């Protein structure tokens, strides 16, 4: 069956790759974006496809539209953007979830929420499993994003339990690949830009904090498997369980770019997680999914 898919945040980094994958499956795509952080260049190559349509709209406002499936990806996802306008960020998370859930309820659509590993905060459990409730500062500089996503998850399950809306919830861990914004403040894009300029690589803290990096094509595969899976609502972790220190990432980027950059150390930001790694046992069991692109290969592809 060729579905009509509504992708909010469809002009963003992950959203644009998702739109592309859906079109490659022969489906129709309504790409909804307010272009706050999304970019038209991300979807320019899709404009000639008759099954692709752009809708300029902000999810904080309701919209009347028909779709079989809704992928809710609308929200600034990097610290630079969500800390610049924290009120807008939490409104997008909460009001956006409410409006998209209301739409899904009205038209009987299946709806998937793009949640985040940030719901775990600075975790005391490692690796993070879906049953872990998290360690989040509700009033810190990151709380507009972290708590906004936690509220959105709650709303999704409330709509499912009370109104029988057919929901899916995924928790996305660090993702990288083509179309990342170079100025979004996320560690992979920061390091690559600095390395290509032979500028100092900025590490916050001592570089011993860890992250897990998933290539965007692997993530999109997991997203589609989750949306297609009947009878499983989540939440489910989607990320690469390979764990690297920030220092290891910096050294790899310098090596692969042939950069002359030196490493500079800066104070660690408040509430920055010290360890972050997904347990993907549930994704393996329920979706038959695990990432296949190793970090070294993905970094090479990102710059190609």
Residue ranges and their predicted role:
Residues 40-41, 153, 189, 247, ...:
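Short, surface-exposed alpha-helical segments at coil->helix boundaries
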Residues 126-127, 182-190:
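A glycine/serine/threonine-rich, flexible loop-to-helix segment
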Residues 48, 180-184, 242, 291:
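Residue-level signature of the cytosolic catalytic core of signaling kinases
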Residues 5, 18, 24, 57, ...:
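C-terminal substrate-binding subdomain of Rossmann-fold SDR/epimerase-dehydratase oxidoreductases
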Residues 93, 148, 184-185, 276:
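Short, conserved glycine- and acidic-residue-centered signature motifs
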Residues 1-175, 217, 289:
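N-terminal Rossmann-like NAD(P)+-binding domain of SDR-like oxidoreductases, especially those catalyzing
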């Amino acid at each position: 069956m060729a579905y009509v898919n509504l992708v909010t945040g469809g002009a963003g980094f992950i959203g644009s790759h998702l739109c592309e994958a859906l079109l490659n499956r022969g489906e129709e795509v309504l790409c909804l974006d307010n272009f706050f952080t999304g970019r038209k260049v991300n979807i320019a190559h899709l404009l000639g496809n008759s099954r692709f349509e752009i809708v300029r709209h902000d999810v904080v406002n309701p919209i009347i539209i028909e779709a079989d499936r809704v992928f809710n990806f609308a929200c600034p996802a990097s610290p630079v953007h969500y800390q610049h306008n924290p009120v807008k960020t939490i409104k997008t998370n909460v009001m956006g979830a409410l409006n998209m859930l209301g739409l899904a309820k009205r038209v009987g659509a299946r709806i998937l929420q793009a949640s985040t590993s940030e719901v775990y905060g600075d975790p005391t459990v490692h690796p993070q499993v879906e049953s872990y409730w998290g360690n989040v500062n509700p009033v810190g500089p990151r709380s507009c994003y972290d708590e906004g996503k936690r509220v959105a998850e709650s709303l999704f399950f409330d709509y499912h339990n009370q109104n029988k809306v057919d929901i899916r919830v995924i928790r996305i861990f660090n993702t990288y690949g083509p179309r990342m914004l170079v100025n979004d403040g996320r560690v992979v894009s920061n390091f690559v830009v600095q390395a290509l300029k032979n500028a100092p690589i900025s590490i916050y803290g001592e570089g011993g904090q860890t992250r897990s990096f998933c290539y965007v094509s692997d993530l999109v595969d997991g997203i589609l498997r989750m949306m297609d899976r009947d009878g499983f609502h989540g939440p489910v972790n989607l990320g690469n369980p390979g764990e690297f220190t920030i220092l290891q990432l910096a050294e790899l980027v310098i090596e692969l770019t042939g950069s002359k950059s030196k490493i500079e150390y800066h104070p660690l930001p408040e509430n920055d997680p010290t360890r972050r790694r997904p347990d993907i046992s549930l994704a393996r069991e329920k979706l038959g999914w695990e990432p296949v692109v190793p970090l070294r290969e993905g970094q090479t592809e990102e710059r190609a």
